[in-house]
């Protein structure tokens, strides 16, 4: 390799140290005196001076090897220190005992130092024990869950319920529950968090045991340990499922050494001394320059030193690295020597100087070391660097994290090192995503947030309560000063975090560089391959938790990736005017169907990819010019058929036998919950003779298109970016897409991966972090209540005052802590910049969906997650970022709302989308969308034809699809217009706890008259739209209310039993749901009757009379069940069972009343008479049910007792805040009208013989005869029956026609055809 900046090329491959034949020639490189001075300057030390005999001779390259050997000679005591040590038993290399020292199911890393719990409570110990002296080891906490860390003896027996600390001779510290364990448990120590380091110390001279957390002693935990014959203590840990740690017994330098205690594994003292001496020589080379002309040595700063190809310098370095290279392959020496040297460079110099020196050092490593040596060295270096970054404590200026990131950047700026690390280390061996994570401090005191944010503040009225909260008070001057001081502290914190984030973005910019292709493939294309495999692990391994990257890492990685991506996108636009800005980014639709990007086994909108290829192959050929090979289709189909029948390969079956006897099982490294530096292979330890692992079937093979397609690993730059004859990723451009590319194709694939990342776990984590804000609100309410009680408490009650004062202090301290932690969360997760990232991702998805929709049937190839991300990212902006930052200030906010509304309105019933889950998500998103005024207005702004199409889909018959959400949408469009339907919370429910005012169900009514008008117009169009829709609504109402009555009968029977009994909470929930469905269906009927009354009252329509009779029948059934005093419904409501809070008289009775008022009061006189006659003709009609609405008592039946005079009666007049005076007057008018009409009907009615009654309903006289079978019934019954079934009700003969029938008439007249 030619060193950059060198004056000549020097290949170390052909270099060998001087031989005897060459000695004379070599010594003539420079003057003998100058060479002697130079070598003495490099290889001499006041501490390790050479012997006198050697010092009298001039130092040259002939005697330099002898001189170096003497320099590196180590005392015999240090050499022998690696042997057996008194007080310790076992191998000198200490690891976890994977052969027999464990219990339960565990995943152990390849280095046998990291472990992941894979069962309820697994335990494992080390291979080495101690019986005398003072010892310690460190545990790196990767997850903060339930774990017990400490010591045990070999006689301890554990199981999956009892672990370390649960037996007599085992001792443990549990930072999750902040306790210590030795059979019994007591409080001890502090809570730990992911990223902490626990030091476990044992003093067997004094018989004590203690722990440290991040180097701070937690005090003595146990005393009087059992010692003596047979008592030796092993490091041990018990951990629950998914929890993970990594041990350091001394194989690496201890992060927090303790004076007087030694690690279980001795450090390589002799090699450490040699490495430090060689490093001193190396540093001397970098600080000295030869001037052969003047014959003198010049001191020079390391940052200005350059390798200029001078033979003297090259030979000197060759001698150094001849001894140094083998040492730099050892983990301990890399971290203790090389890492310290490089960090010193970064800490002392400017970033530019540091990068220059590190670049020179890496050049020399690649030049003078064999490839395998420098690769091992770089691997260990990055592992140590990542470990240091992840497990460093948070300090106020984040200085430690900044230094580690600056060193990482300096290393990655070296092109050859960067490509090696990308290809082999960053994604394969260690978790490079950790570099982009900023951990949240659990203990704000240790993170220095008290100094950074000295003044705390929290809102006195929760922003989650909504802007209309009646408790909002005007801010006082003192509160204003506190808030401003708090905001200044938050701003200081944000600026410091932004420094770290900018360094993390620089790392990704280096990994996304595509101009460094001089020595092979550019970094960006290596990154793309590794990034896609990373996504595959997290998308395909959801059932295996250890395979998943923690979501908190994903959130940070996504934001840094978006920043780097947009930087390169806009940079490309600057040099290519025809490209687009990142603000206009989207994924072209051909990416989804041309097979160039692997989407693993992720679901497409139209179903399975193999199915889409078969059914849409003609469309692919005609629209995209892509031909699918029929043989490949056939083989893919056969693979799908045989998938469940394929036996496991032999090589996958053999490890299962080892597993059954508790042996190690190599696995593809999950490692996401364990040490950040694990090898790719793990060992699966199990004490049970069962297998929990099944071999995964290889992912689908690459599909043949018009040009060749390759697997992710085989792709080249040309396959991605394309060439003059190949469009690369954009193969198969549909005619709707522009010819000019948006940007570089590789950036499109990165963007696609970013969208997938959000769907995998980022959205879930964003919702989880809101919990800190909720905690602040709850404690603020508790503090406010306590202060109110203090003001009201009498001064003579000093005991109560003391308790309240104590509570006030506890709440204030907790709020101080939480407000500082909330500032950290807002700065790292919910900042304005992060909000803009999520908003940009939302707009990318919207444009992608819009462009995909234009391709017609090919839209089915789009992965489902694009629609999911569009829905979820909007939800995150509104619910998670909204309380902190205003959405209205986002650029193009109104336009984005409208575009999202158009997508939801069009695709919630799109036949191209077949997945049940995504269809439900679209329906729920639309239902939520119409609950909020600003988003409902956006729905009203979409083009008229789209609005009409949406309403038409909402009015489709309910039997053909899931209908509950559809009905909910229609109800929301009506809420605020119905009778007594202006409430947000039901009148009988009190606001007893803090609730999220952003919930859709708690929004104030915001009806849409525009969409109501579309509904009215559609119901009047065509003879079948209204009857089919209303028939389905009436059917579902009949079902829902019948189910509700049946369930409350069971609940009532259970409540009346004398023995103790419990009602299943799920049954109560289903019962309440059926009640809510009944109410919402009644409201839809009320809306329909109000908007289009002629559907029921214009009897020139063939179905109007039938629909009106069915409606009257159902209304009477509901009234009779609900209004009967001391009846079933009344008794269940009185019980006030938890889960049935929504079940009450008011919501269902006002819905029924609204329908009756519309039929009997508001319409024309002729229509009112028709409705009245039908209602009174129904045999279930009872006037007392109407009287009940206004609280008028029911006259007692003969033989029954009079009702209690003090019994509280239901009356609509009691709800003056919810029902207007005009509405009450209409109810009174309706009651008067029905009282008069029922009296007249009773006087005019004639007795009817039983033979003349309809044999179906026994309520109306026979008026129709069926042809050809001749059976008879009333018209209402047969018309209702024919709406759903064309067979005779009695004999199942197909009905051809229905004819009018009158008793005594000789002929019948055909009234309607079946």
Swiss-Prot record:
<dbReference type="InterPro" id="IPR001841">
    <property type="entry name" value="Znf_RING"/>
</dbReference>
<dbReference type="GO" id="GO:0061630">
    <property type="term" value="F:ubiquitin protein ligase activity"/>
</dbReference>
<dbReference type="InterPro" id="IPR001870">
    <property type="entry name" value="B30.2/SPRY"/>
</dbReference>
<keyword id="KW-0963">Cytoplasm</keyword>
<feature type="zinc finger region" description="RING-type">
    <location>
        <begin position="1254"/>
        <end position="1292"/>
    </location>
</feature>
<comment type="function">
    <text>Catalytic subunit of the KPC complex that acts as E3 ubiquitin-protein ligase. Promotes the ubiquitination and proteasome-mediated degradation of CDKN1B which is the cyclin-dependent kinase inhibitor at the G0-G1 transition of the cell cycle. Also acts as a key regulator of the NF-kappa-B signaling by promoting maturation of the NFKB1 component of NF-kappa-B: acts by catalyzing ubiquitination of the NFKB1 p105 precursor, leading to limited proteasomal degradation of NFKB1 p105 and generation of the active NFKB1 p50 subunit.</text>
</comment>
<dbReference type="GO" id="GO:0000209">
    <property type="term" value="P:protein polyubiquitination"/>
</dbReference>
<feature type="region of interest" description="Interaction with NFKB1">
    <location>
        <begin position="968"/>
        <end position="974"/>
    </location>
</feature>
<keyword id="KW-0597">Phosphoprotein</keyword>
<dbReference type="InterPro" id="IPR043136">
    <property type="entry name" value="B30.2/SPRY_sf"/>
</dbReference>
<feature type="modified residue" description="Asymmetric dimethylarginine">
    <location>
        <position position="683"/>
    </location>
</feature>
<dbReference type="InterPro" id="IPR035773">
    <property type="entry name" value="SPRY_RNF123"/>
</dbReference>
<dbReference type="GO" id="GO:0008270">
    <property type="term" value="F:zinc ion binding"/>
</dbReference>
<feature type="modified residue" description="N-acetylalanine">
    <location>
        <position position="2"/>
    </location>
</feature>
<dbReference type="InterPro" id="IPR003877">
    <property type="entry name" value="SPRY_dom"/>
</dbReference>
<dbReference type="InterPro" id="IPR013320">
    <property type="entry name" value="ConA-like_dom_sf"/>
</dbReference>
<dbReference type="GO" id="GO:0005829">
    <property type="term" value="C:cytosol"/>
</dbReference>
<feature type="modified residue" description="Phosphoserine">
    <location>
        <position position="675"/>
    </location>
</feature>
<keyword id="KW-0863">Zinc-finger</keyword>
<feature type="binding site">
    <location>
        <position position="1269"/>
    </location>
    <ligand>
        <name>Zn(2+) 2</name>
    </ligand>
</feature>
<feature type="binding site">
    <location>
        <position position="1288"/>
    </location>
    <ligand>
        <name>Zn(2+) 2</name>
    </ligand>
</feature>
<feature type="binding site">
    <location>
        <position position="1257"/>
    </location>
    <ligand>
        <name>Zn(2+) 1</name>
    </ligand>
</feature>
<feature type="binding site">
    <location>
        <position position="1277"/>
    </location>
    <ligand>
        <name>Zn(2+) 1</name>
    </ligand>
</feature>
<feature type="binding site">
    <location>
        <position position="1254"/>
    </location>
    <ligand>
        <name>Zn(2+) 1</name>
    </ligand>
</feature>
<keyword id="KW-0862">Zinc</keyword>
<dbReference type="GO" id="GO:0031965">
    <property type="term" value="C:nuclear membrane"/>
</dbReference>
<dbReference type="GO" id="GO:0005737">
    <property type="term" value="C:cytoplasm"/>
</dbReference>
<feature type="binding site">
    <location>
        <position position="1291"/>
    </location>
    <ligand>
        <name>Zn(2+) 2</name>
    </ligand>
</feature>
<dbReference type="GO" id="GO:0006511">
    <property type="term" value="P:ubiquitin-dependent protein catabolic process"/>
</dbReference>
<keyword id="KW-0832">Ubl conjugation</keyword>
<keyword id="KW-0479">Metal-binding</keyword>
<comment type="subunit">
    <text>Component of the KPC complex composed of RNF123/KPC1 and UBAC1/KPC2. Interacts with UBAC1 and CDKN1B via its N-terminal domain. Interacts with RIGI (via N-terminus) and IFIH1 (via N-terminus).</text>
</comment>
<feature type="binding site">
    <location>
        <position position="1271"/>
    </location>
    <ligand>
        <name>Zn(2+) 2</name>
    </ligand>
</feature>
<dbReference type="InterPro" id="IPR013083">
    <property type="entry name" value="Znf_RING/FYVE/PHD"/>
</dbReference>
<comment type="pathway">
    <text>Protein modification; protein ubiquitination.</text>
</comment>
<dbReference type="GO" id="GO:0051604">
    <property type="term" value="P:protein maturation"/>
</dbReference>
<keyword id="KW-0833">Ubl conjugation pathway</keyword>
<keyword id="KW-0007">Acetylation</keyword>
<feature type="binding site">
    <location>
        <position position="1274"/>
    </location>
    <ligand>
        <name>Zn(2+) 1</name>
    </ligand>
</feature>
<keyword id="KW-0488">Methylation</keyword>
<dbReference type="Pfam" id="PF13920">
    <property type="entry name" value="zf-C3HC4_3"/>
</dbReference>
<dbReference type="GO" id="GO:0004842">
    <property type="term" value="F:ubiquitin-protein transferase activity"/>
</dbReference>
């Amino acid at each position: 390799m030619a060193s950059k900046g060198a004056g000549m090329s020097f290949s170390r491959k052909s270099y060998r140290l001087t031989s005897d034949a060459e000695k004379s020639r070599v010594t003539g490189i420079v003057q003998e005196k100058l060479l002697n001075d130079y070598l003495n300057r490099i290889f001499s030390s006041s501490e390790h001076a050479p012997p006198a005999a050697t010092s009298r001779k001039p130092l040259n390259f002939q005697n330099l090897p002898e001189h170096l050997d003497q320099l590196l000679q180590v005392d015999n005591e240090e050499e022998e220190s690696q042997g057996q040590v008194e007080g310790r038993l076992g191998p000198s290399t200490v690891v976890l005992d994977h052969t027999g020292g464990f219990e339960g199911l565990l995943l152990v890393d390849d280095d046998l130092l990291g472990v992941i719990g894979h069962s309820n409570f697994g335990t494992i110990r080390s291979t080495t024990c101690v019986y005398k002296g003072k010892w310690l080891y460190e545990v790196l906490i990767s997850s903060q869950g339930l774990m017990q860390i400490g010591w045990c003896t070999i006689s301890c027996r554990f199981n999956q319920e009892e672990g370390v600390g649960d037996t007599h001779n085992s001792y443990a510290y549990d930072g999750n529950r902040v306790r210590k364990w030795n059979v019994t448990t007591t409080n001890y120590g502090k809570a730990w968090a992911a990223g902490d380091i626990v030091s476990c110390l044992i003093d067997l001279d004094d018989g004590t045991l203690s722990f440290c957390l991040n180097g701070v002693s937690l005090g003595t935990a146990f005393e009087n340990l059992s010692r003596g014959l047979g008592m030796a203590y092993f490091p041990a840990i018990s951990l629950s499922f998914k929890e993970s740690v990594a041990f350091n017994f001394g194989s690496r330098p201890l992060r927090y050494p303790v004076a007087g205690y030694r690690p279980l594994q001795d450090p390589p003292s002799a090699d450490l001394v040699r490495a430090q001496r060689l490093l001193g020589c190396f540093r001397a080379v970098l600080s000295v320059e030869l001037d052969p002309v003047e014959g003198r040595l010049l001191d020079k700063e390391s940052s200005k030193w350059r390798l200029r190809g001078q033979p003297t310098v090259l030979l000197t370095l060759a001698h150094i690295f001849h001894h140094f290279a083998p040492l730099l392959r050892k983990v301990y020496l890399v971290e203790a020597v090389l890492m310290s040297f490089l960090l010193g460079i970064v800490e002392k110099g400017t970033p530019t100087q540091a990068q220059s020196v590190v670049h020179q050092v890496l050049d020399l490593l690649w030049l003078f070391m064999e490839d395998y040596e420098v690769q091992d060295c770089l691997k260990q270096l990055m592992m140590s660097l990542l470990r240091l970054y992840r497990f460093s404590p948070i300090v106020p200026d984040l200085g430690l994290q900044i230094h580690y990131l600056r060193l990482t950047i300096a290393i990655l700026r070296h092109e050859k090192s960067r490509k090696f690390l990308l290809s082999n280390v960053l994604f394969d061996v260690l978790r490079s995503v950790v570099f982009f994570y900023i951990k949240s401090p659990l203990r704000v005191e240790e993170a220095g947030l008290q100094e950074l944010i000295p003044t705390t503040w929290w809102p006195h009225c929760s922003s989650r309560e909504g802007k209309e909260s009646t408790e909002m008070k005007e801010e006082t001057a003192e509160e204003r000063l506190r808030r401003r001081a708090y905001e200044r502290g938050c701003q200081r914190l944000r600026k410091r975090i932004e420094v770290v984030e900018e360094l993390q973005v620089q790392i990704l910019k280096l990994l996304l560089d595509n101009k460094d292709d001089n020595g092979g493939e550019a970094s960006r294309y290596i990154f793309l391959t590794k990034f896609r495999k990373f996504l595959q692990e997290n998308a395909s391994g959801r059932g295996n938790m250890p395979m998943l990257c923690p979501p908190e890492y994903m959130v940070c990685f996504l934001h840094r990736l978006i920043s780097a991506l947009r930087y390169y996108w806009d940079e490309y636009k600057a040099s290519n005017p025809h490209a687009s800005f990142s603000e206009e980014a989207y994924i072209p639709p051909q990416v989804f169907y041309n097979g160039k990007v692997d989407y693993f086994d992720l679901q497409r909108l139209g179903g399975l990819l193999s199915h889409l290829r078969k059914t849409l192959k003609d469309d692919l050929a005609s629209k995209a010019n892509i031909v699918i090979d029929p043989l490949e289709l056939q083989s893919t189909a056969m693979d799908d058929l045989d998938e469940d029948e394929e036996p496991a390969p032999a090589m996958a079956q053999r490890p299962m036998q080892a597993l059954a006897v508790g042996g190690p099982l190599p696995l593809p490294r999950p490692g996401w919950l364990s040490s950040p530096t694990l090898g790719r292979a793990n060992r699966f330890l199990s004490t049970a003779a069962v297998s929990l692992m099944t071999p995964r079937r290889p992912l689908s093979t690459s599909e043949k298109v018009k040009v060749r397609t390759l697997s992710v690993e085989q792709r080249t730059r040309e396959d991605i970016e394309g060439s003059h004859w190949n469009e690369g990723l954009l193969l198969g451009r549909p005619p709707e897409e522009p010819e000019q590319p948006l940007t570089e194709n590789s950036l499109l694939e990165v963007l696609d991966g970013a969208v997938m990342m959000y769907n995998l776990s980022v959205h879930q984590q964003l919702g989880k972090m809101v919990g800190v804000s909720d905690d602040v609100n709850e404690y603020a309410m508790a503090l406010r209540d306590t202060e109110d009680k203090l003001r009201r408490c009498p001064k003579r009650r000093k005991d109560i005052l003391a308790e309240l004062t104590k509570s006030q202090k506890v709440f204030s301290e907790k709020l101080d802590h939480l407000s500082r932690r909330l500032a950290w969360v807002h700065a790292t997760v919910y900042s304005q910049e992060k909000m803009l990232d999520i908003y940009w991702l939302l707009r990318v998805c919207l444009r992608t969906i819009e462009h995909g929709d234009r391709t017609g049937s090919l839209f089915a190839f789009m992965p489902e997650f694009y629609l999911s991300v569009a829905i979820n990212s909007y939800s995150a902006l509104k619910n998670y970022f909204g309380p902190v930052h205003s959405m209205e200030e986002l650029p193009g906010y109104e336009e984005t709302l409208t575009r999202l509304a158009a997508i939801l309105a069009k695709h919630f019933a799109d036949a191209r989308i077949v997945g049940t889950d995504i269809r439900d998500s679209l329906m729920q998103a639309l239902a939520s969308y119409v609950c909020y005024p600003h988003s409902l207005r956006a729905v009203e702004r979409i083009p008229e034809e789209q609005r009409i199409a949406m309403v038409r889909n909402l009015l489709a018959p309910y039997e053909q699809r899931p209908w509950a959400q559809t009905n909910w949408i229609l109800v929301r469009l009506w809420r605020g217009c119905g009778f007594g339907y202006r409430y947000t919370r039901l009148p009988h429910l009190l606001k007893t706890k803090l609730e999220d005012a952003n919930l859709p169900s708690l929004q104030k009514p915001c009806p849409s008259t525009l969409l109501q008008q579309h509904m009215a117009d559609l119901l009047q169009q065509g003879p079948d739209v209204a009857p089919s829709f209303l028939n389905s609504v009436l059917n579902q109402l009949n079902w829902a209310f019948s189910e509700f009555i049946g369930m409350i009968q069971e609940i009532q029977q259970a409540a009346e039993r004398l023995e103790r009994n419990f009602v299943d909470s799920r049954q109560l929930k289903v019962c309440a749901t059926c009640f809510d469905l009944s109410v919402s269906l009644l409201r839809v009927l009320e809306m329909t009757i109000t908007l289009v009354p002629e559907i029921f009252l214009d009897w020139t329509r063939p179905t109007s009379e039938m629909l009106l009779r069915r409606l009257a029948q159902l209304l009477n059934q509901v009234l009779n069940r609900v209004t009967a005093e001391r009846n079933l419904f009344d008794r269940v409501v009185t019980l006030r069972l938890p889960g049935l809070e929504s079940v009450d008289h008011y919501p269902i009775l006002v819905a029924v009343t609204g329908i009756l008022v519309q039929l009997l009061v508001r319409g024309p006189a002729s229509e009112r008479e028709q409705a009245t006659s039908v209602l009174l003709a129904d045999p279930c009609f009872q006037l007392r049910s109407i009287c009940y609405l206004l609280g008028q008592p029911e006259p007692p039946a003969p033989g029954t007792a009079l009702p209690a005079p003090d019994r509280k009666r239901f009356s609509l007049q009691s709800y003056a805040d919810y029902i207007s005076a005009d509405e009450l007057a209409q109810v009174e008018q309706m009651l008067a009208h029905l009282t008069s009409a029922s009296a007249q009907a009773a006087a005019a009615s004639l007795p009817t013989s039983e033979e003349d009654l309809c044999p179906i309903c026994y309520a109306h006289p026979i008026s129709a005869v069926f042809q050809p079978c001749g059976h008879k019934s009333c018209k209402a019954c047969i018309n209702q029956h024919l709406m759903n079934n064309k067979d005779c009700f009695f004999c199942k003969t197909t009905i051809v026609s229905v004819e009018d029938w009158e008793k005594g008439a000789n002929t019948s007249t055909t009234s309607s055809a079946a």
